[in-house]
Amino acid sequence: YIDAETMHLHHDKHHQAYVNNANAALEKHPEIGEDLEALLADVESIPADIRQALINNGGGHLNHALFWELMTPEKTAPSAELAAAIDATFGSFEEFQAAFTAAATTRFGSGWAWLVVNKEGKLEVTSTANQDTPISEGKKPILGL
């Protein structure tokens, strides 16, 4: 359970600040475009003077956008395809939950726990610090907390 005050803070304050700051950085270099996923997949292509701002704020925007997209008041189960992939990778849904919980609870300071598809096309549980996104590591996030 996450209380309304925490949700308001993250949605209306934190997430909005990430969007505003990412947009301000992008305005300095209109030639690079506005596709944050593409830019963060190749951070070295981002001009040095805005690179860290986009890593922090672009990552914060993408991370929170996925979080909001996945949130629902109803309890949901993974699709049959995802459930089979979880079982094949982790042994069971319960083992996946244990790995995901460990990634979330052992992250020192702020950050995210992720279920991602890695470069080899396999599921992986990982963790990133602060607002770093697994996209910068060539991974596709499918669940984030």
Swiss-Prot record:
Top-level taxon in the UniProt lineage: Bacteria
The encoding gene: sodA
Organism of this sequence: Streptococcus oralis
InterPro entries recorded: Mn/Fe_SOD, Mn/Fe_SOD_C, Mn/Fe_SOD_N, Mn/Fe_SOD_N_sf, SOD_C_sf
GO CC terms of this entry: cytoplasm
Binding-site residues for Fe(3+), renumbered to this chain: H10, H64
Effect of A17T: In strain: CIP 103216
Protein family membership: Belongs to the iron/manganese superoxide dismutase family.
Cofactor binding annotation: Binds 1 Mn(2+) or Fe(3+) ion per subunit.
Phenotypic consequence of A113V: In strain: NEM1121
Substitution effect: I32T: In strain: CIP 102922T
Keywords for the protein's UniProt record, in alphabetical order: Iron, Manganese, Metal-binding, Oxidoreductase
Effect after changing E44D: In strain: CIP 102922T
Record-given protein name: Superoxide dismutase [Mn/Fe]
